[in-house]
Amino acid sequence: MKKQLLLAITLMWAMLANAQMSVQLGYLLNTEKSKVAGVKSSSSYSGFMAAADYNLNLTGALSVAPGLGLGYSFDNSDGAKYKELGLFVPVDFNYRFPVSDGFSLSVFAGPTLYYGLLSKDTSTDPAYNYYDNDNGRFSLELGGGLWCDIKETVRVKAGYKWGLTNNSKIDGVTEKNNCLYLSVGYLF
């Protein structure tokens, strides 16, 4: 038992020694797709995101990058004053393609768990909180995309996440959130 524990700790330490941390800032575009009584509609909100991840090498060019991020989106058009704030936890599996000295491309895909902190319409008095009434806070998303690393210092990342779970608590209503994002990050 002691040997197995020592082996597990040694393997974990070796993975962490080869891991690379990154922090990113970027733009996001959330699209809320809903279906009520068979009628489909969608609305989009721009925003910003900040995230950090830890890219752990699994084997060769294959890695996994668990992370933690914060996204803020808003809409101030047509009299609406909508804002949403949430935490997201992605687990992206990625495959790296070295292109040239100091430049590589990686494709990634994986699940993301989203937890909504705030979802309000402040154009009404009092403000309407969607999480108190209509929507659930948790959602599961599946995402993918591409990133490029420049000189092992800068990462440019573009991705898309598809909402898999129905966020609505209202019977007969389906609501899913999708997200397009573009970020620039620093590699440690």
Could you tell me what each predicted segment is?
Residues 1-22:
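Cleavable N-terminal export/targeting peptides
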Residues 53-55, 92-96, 145-149, 157, ...:
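Transmembrane beta-barrel domains of outer membrane proteins
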Residues 27-33, 56, 70-76, 83-85, ...:
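Transmembrane beta-strands of outer-membrane beta-barrel pores
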Residues 22-24, 28, 148, 176-188:
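Outer-membrane beta-barrel "beta-signal"
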Residues 23-25, 66-68, 89-91, 107-111, ...:
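Membrane-embedded beta-strand positions of outer-membrane beta-barrel proteins
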Residues 21-23, 60-64, 100-103, 148, ...:
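Repeated loop/turn-to-beta-strand initiation elements of outer-membrane beta-barrel proteins
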Residues 34-41, 76-83, 118-128, 168-174:
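Outer-membrane beta-barrel translocator domains and adjoining extracellular loop/strand segments
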Residues 21, 42-48, 81-89, 136-140, ...:
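Residues that define the transmembrane beta-barrel architecture of outer-membrane proteins
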